[in-house]
Amino acid sequence: MLITSCDNEKIKKYLKLKEKKYRDFYNEFLVEGEHLVVEAYRSNLLEEILIEQDEVTILDVPITYVSKEILNKLSSLETPTHIIGVCKKKEENSELGNKLLLLDRVQDPGNLGTIIRSSKAFGVDTVVLGNGCVDLYNEKVIRSTQGIGFHMNIVNRDLKKLIPNL
């Protein structure tokens, strides 16, 4: 089946995932491009793939065929990709480990993504996002992490409550 209308209920839901409140409500987010879709798949986060009818995938997840116009609407890129993944949010691991990186009010998505990638390189166990940090599932954060965040423990905490207990 090929979905060509933005009035389709599934597509309406996925369009809402561009906003944080709906990502939180549905506990899902979107990724764009083959690399991020594969990284989400490797992390067991990928629930569904949206692709054009003439595209092929070897990943073992449900596929929904959509028109190029739908992919363009769902995309946040200037040059949309031919594949979008619908993913479930990662469950937070309450065990923080020994090497923590505490972040307070990092609001630029690109900066947060770069910090997350760097923290992985430096062997950080957990990245703690304090109040005021940009949403981890913001599409720009996801792109700038290049999927590294899918393989790390990243949690949201109130730093005022957390720090005295460390």
Please describe what each predicted stretch is.
Residues 47-48, 64, 125:
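A short, local hydrophobic-aromatic micro-motif
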Residues 53-96, 139-166:
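S-adenosyl-L-methionine/SAH cofactor-binding core of RNA-modifying enzymes
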Residues 30, 50, 84-86, 101-102, ...:
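Structural motif
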Residues 41, 75, 111:
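A short local structural element in Rossmann-fold oxidoreductases
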Residues 1-53, 133-134:
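Boundary-proximal intrinsically disordered activation/regulatory segments immediately upstream
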Residues 96-166:
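RNA substrate-binding interface of SAM-dependent RNA methyltransferases
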